[in-house]
């Protein structure tokens, strides 16, 4: 094993914790969006719904990562779902940011969405690296 490689057991722990962090951070940011004033109701609702998707998908994958399977882990379906999650959330937050920026929302809110997207994509990239190391 190389110095930076992780084991499957470590992946399960790390990925489970990362999904929890993504969930908590997104939930906190979603609450902040609810308090935004000065943007349209439609724009605010789009941001909230986008974040809700992240919450639901992250929670599902957290549970699937930490679940104990009779036939063992990892299973093909998990890796397929993880790939879909990674592909979706490496682009979705940037698309949301670009959409809101094109609506010319307040610079403060635009910066907020930029850092939300950057944080989420950085986490997803880290998760993708871990998964590629342990994928059997």
Set out the residue ranges of the language-model regions.
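Long, low-complexity or tandemly repetitive, helically biased scaffold regions used
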Residues: 2-136
């Amino acid at each position: 094993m190389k110095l930076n490689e992780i084991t499957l057991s470590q992946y399960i722990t790390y990925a489970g914790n990362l999904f929890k962090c993504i969930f908590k951070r997104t939930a906190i940011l979603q609450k902040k969006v609810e308090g935004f004033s000065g943007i349209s109701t439609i724009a605010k609702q789009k941001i909230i719904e986008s974040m809700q998707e992240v919450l639901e998908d992250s929670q599902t994958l957290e549970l699937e990562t930490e679940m104990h399977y009779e036939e063992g882990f990892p299973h093909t379906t998990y890796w397929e779902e993880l790939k879909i999650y990674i592909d979706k959330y490496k682009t979705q937050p940037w698309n949301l940011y670009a959409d809101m920026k094109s609506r010319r929302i307040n610079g403060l809110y635009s910066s907020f969405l930029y850092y939300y997207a950057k944080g989420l994509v950085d986490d997803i990239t880290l998760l993708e690296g871990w998964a590629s190391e342990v994928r059997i």
